[in-house]
Amino acid sequence: QSPINIVSYDAKFLRRLPKLKFKPHMEKLKTEVTNHQNRAPEFEPEDGENLYVKLNNLVDGHYKFHNLHVHNGRTRRKGSEHSVNGHFTPMEAHLVFHHDEQTHFEPTRTKLGGAFPGHNDFVVVGVFLEVGDDGFGDEPDDEECKHILKGHHPDNNENGNGDNGNNGYNGDNGNNGDNGNNGYNGDNGNNGVNGNNGYNGDNGNNGDNGNNGYNGDNGNNGDNGNNGENGNNGENGNNGENGHKHGCRVKKAKHLSRILECAYRNDKVREFKKVGEEEGLDVHLTPEMPLPPLKYRHYYTYEGSLTTPPCTESVLWVVQKCHVQVSRRVLHALRNVEGY
């Protein structure tokens, strides 16, 4: 039964697990906000919106985007549903995908050692959300919220322009970084913070300050390589997991934060009282918004259940190792939604 406490040192590393992707990539979805069983507002795609999760070799069949919702708890220290080694975060985002019965592909439940009878009705992607104050700007005013809730986007998003460089400190695909030419956080940038081959280069062999960095997807000594979490140089060693926030860059989800702030502050959403109530806010989302950048989508996967009634036990969970940060205002706004 989900959720669970994930014990990282008991997890088995499998190199053949696929990267988490979506089809079509970076598709903007029109969504409306509904009452998630008096637990959390959820963003559901409008009719005709088709987006599928891609996890080749892990799940067969077509799993269509069903909703995005965020959970939080009574305290900031214990808000996420899942935990890792007993540690929680203030919130947890869930991207829910349901088997598309309109397709001709019958899903099979794929065990890590091969397929077995039965199938998963759902694939749920879980993301640990941290909260922060820096870098999120002033609280959006009513005029900005009105603009956002009509499906418009701010000028600078995760693929836009950053602090001081031409293509952005946090531009997921930007080449140029915070103050320099070759990009601290460019997904495809060749050169990183201190080295020739880049802290965040997808294929860079060298890490932040050392020879064998964690974050080169194809680097020699990454998180799951020769000197990984349980290897000779362990979690706190030169080549271990904790070189930079557990081997991850914590993405500031600025655009998502403003969308959630505005949606949760909306009068009708705040006054949800009945299961099934909905407010037709024309919010445009992409599933990438609450996720870490592509190269940081390392994950734990297990078979469990939905965490809300009917608690169906046919769910493939894909829980991201790397965290994402949203504004503290999101947490406060979500807690003010009536009935939650």
Swiss-Prot record:
Subunit structure: Homooligomer; disulfide-linked. May also be disulfide-linked to insoluble organic matrix.
Sequence repeat residue numbers: 162-164, 165-167, 168-170, 171-173, 174-176, 177-179, 180-182, 183-185, 186-188, 189-191, 192-194, 195-197, 198-200, 201-203, 204-206, 207-209, 210-212, 213-215, 216-218, 219-221, 222-224, 225-227, 228-230, 231-233, 234-236, 237-238, 240-242
Listed EC numbers: 4.2.1.1
Family label: Belongs to the alpha-carbonic anhydrase family.
Cofactor: Zn(2+)
Protein residues bound to Zn(2+): H69, H71, H94
Residue spans of biased composition, Low complexity class: 157-241
Reactions it catalyzes: hydrogencarbonate + H(+) = CO2 + H2O
Domain-related comment: The Gly-Xaa-Asn repeat domain binds calcium.
GO cellular component terms, semicolon-separated: extracellular region
Tissue specificity annotation: Expressed in the mantle.
Record's protein name: Nacrein-like protein C1
Organism encoding this protein: Crassostrea nippona (Iwagaki oyster)
Cellular localization per UniProt: Secreted, Extracellular space, Extracellular matrix
